[in-house]
């Protein structure tokens, strides 16, 4: 049992160690390949999962966006219906007022029928002509409003379609940006995987080179030992010439073994020389490959840095554009809300002011132009020639506001005329006040009236106007008589003198 244990503890030979080491290397390479396959499978599964999630998210975004667009369209249609209903009610009120005025005229004409038949018939003809004119005007106004509403509807429809197309393009751009980001991330992961693979390859080559150097050192050591043993053997044979005959058989046997070993050694030396040459060639090739790979790696890293810088710059620009777009959209929404509030306020004021409209304003809300059609055409052509195309388009877009500005200008003119009339009445009132004050001063007596010059005021048959002749001077010893005032109205004096 002890001999078997000693045999089990015998160390392995160099060839067995080399085979064991090669088996370990093969096992490690198989493990690395297996890990690489697992990593590739994991990345493929992750890629498929990301593509599936992106498709689901895109479908969700499209469905939510459709609901938002439907809500916006319904609100706009509700607003259009409200505006149309208000205009219809206003037209109906105008027609009701026209019918009331015509009924009133007809009743008056029937009352006067017994007195003047001819005048009645004449007035009936005038009323019919007036009615025809009014109906024509109403029809023209209705047609104009209908055309304006159709144009407004078409423009709103066009703007909505354009906005929808812009939003579709924006979503497509967002999708392309997401796809580009995904491609960039995939490319970065591929670069990282390639760099890791190159590092592992370089590491394996270095380990292989180190093992080859180690094996060469072992072979050289064995050769040196063999030479020493051979030298010792030759020395021993010289010292033991006496035992040559006895050991001749052993010598021949050993010589044959030595020759066999020498052949093996020669073969090993030849194989070592061949392996050294191959190692040198492979080392040179590996150095060149490593140099090329390092240069390619540097170029790839430089390009990667540039791409990362460009991506960060593009991301910053996109973020700035997004912030600017949100600010501008919020500002436009605020401005549109203010415009809508102003329009609602104007409509409310118009409804309030309709109570104070006269019959004439209800029948003919818009005054006709004093210009002839020819002059109107000349002015329109001249205005369009003066402005450029863009400004002309804007003016044509706001042409439907002419009736509004007509009523506005009419109100401003009436306001100015009322102010002018008020100033005239104030001036007349001041003049009347002055005349009344003078009249009251003439019929009343007070210290202020006595102190002022008044030709109508006479005391003791004398007025208080200054006399041309000088008054006699009084003596210093004389006493002034008490002042007595006899008041006589000027009208009484004039009646007696006449």
Curated annotation (Swiss-Prot):
Its main location: cytoplasm. Keywords: Cell projection, Cilium, Coiled coil, Cytoplasm, Cytoskeleton, Flagellum. Signal peptide: none annotated. It is found in: Cytoplasm, Cytoskeleton, Flagellum basal body; Cell projection, Cilium, Flagellum; Cytoplasm, Cytoskeleton, Flagellum axoneme. One of its GO terms (cellular component) is axonemal dynein complex. Pfam families: NYD-SP28 (PF14772). It comes from the Eukaryota. InterPro entries: DRC1/2_N, DRC1/DRC2. Component of the nexin-dynein regulatory complex (N-DRC). Interacts with DRC1. This is Dynein regulatory complex subunit 2. It comes from Bos taurus (Bovine).
């Amino acid at each position: 049992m002890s001999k078997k244990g000693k045999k089990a503890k015998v160390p392995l030979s160099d060839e067995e160690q080399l085979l064991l080491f090669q088996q370990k290397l093969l096992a490690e390479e198989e493990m690395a390949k297996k890990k690489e396959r697992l990593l590739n499978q994991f990345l493929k599964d992750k890629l498929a999962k990301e593509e599936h999630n992106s498709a689901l998210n895109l479908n969700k975004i499209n469905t939510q966006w459709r609901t938002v667009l439907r809500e916006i369209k319904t609100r706009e249609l509700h607003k259009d219906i409200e505006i149309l209903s208000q205009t219809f009610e206003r037209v109906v009120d105008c027609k009701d007022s026209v019918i009331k005025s015509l009924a009133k005229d007809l009743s008056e004409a029937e009352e006067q029928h017994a007195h003047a038949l001819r005048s009645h018939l004449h007035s009936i003809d005038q009323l019919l002509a007036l009615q025809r004119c009014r109906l024509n005007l109403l029809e023209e106004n209705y047609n104009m409003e209908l055309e304006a509403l159709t144009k407004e509807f078409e423009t709103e429809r066009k703007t909505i379609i354009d906005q929808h197309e812009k939003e579709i393009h924006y979503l497509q751009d967002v999708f392309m940006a997401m796809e580009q980001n995904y491609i960039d991330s995939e490319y970065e992961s591929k670069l990282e995987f390639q760099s890791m693979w190159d590092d592992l390859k370089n590491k394996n080559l270095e380990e292989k080179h180190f093992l080859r150097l180690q094996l060469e050192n072992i072979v050289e050591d064995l050769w040196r030992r063999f030479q020493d043993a051979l030298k010792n053997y030759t020395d021993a044979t010289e010292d033991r010439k006496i035992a040559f005959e006895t050991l001749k058989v052993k010598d021949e046997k050993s010589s044959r073994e030595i020759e066999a070993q020498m052949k093996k050694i020669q073969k090993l030396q030849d194989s070592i020389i061949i392996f050294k040459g191959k190692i040198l060639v492979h080392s040179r090739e590996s150095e060149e490959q490593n140099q090329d790979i390092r240069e390619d790696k540097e170029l790839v890293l430089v390009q990667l840095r540039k791409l990362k810088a460009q991506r960060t710059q593009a991301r910053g620009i996109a973020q700035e554009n997004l912030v600017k777009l949100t600010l501008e959209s919020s500002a436009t929404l605020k401005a549109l809300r203010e415009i809508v509030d102003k329009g609602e306020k104007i409509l409310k004021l118009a409804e309030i002011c309709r109570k104070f409209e006269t019959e004439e304003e209800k029948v003919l809300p818009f005054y006709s132009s004093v210009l002839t059609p020819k002059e109107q055409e000349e002015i329109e052509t001249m205005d369009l020639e003066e402005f450029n195309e863009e400004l002309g388009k804007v003016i044509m877009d706001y042409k439907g506001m002419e009736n509004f500005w007509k009523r506005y200008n009419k109100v401003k003119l009436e306001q100015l005329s009322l102010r002018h009339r008020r100033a005239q009445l104030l001036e007349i009132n001041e003049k009347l006040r002055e005349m009344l004050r003078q009249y009251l001063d003439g019929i009343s007596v007070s210290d202020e009236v006595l102190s002022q010059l008044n030709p109508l005021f006479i005391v003791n048959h004398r007025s208080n106007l200054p006399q041309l002749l000088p008054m006699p001077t009084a003596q210093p010893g004389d006493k002034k008589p008490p002042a007595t005032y006899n008041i006589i109205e000027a009208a009484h004096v004039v009646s007696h003198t006449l």
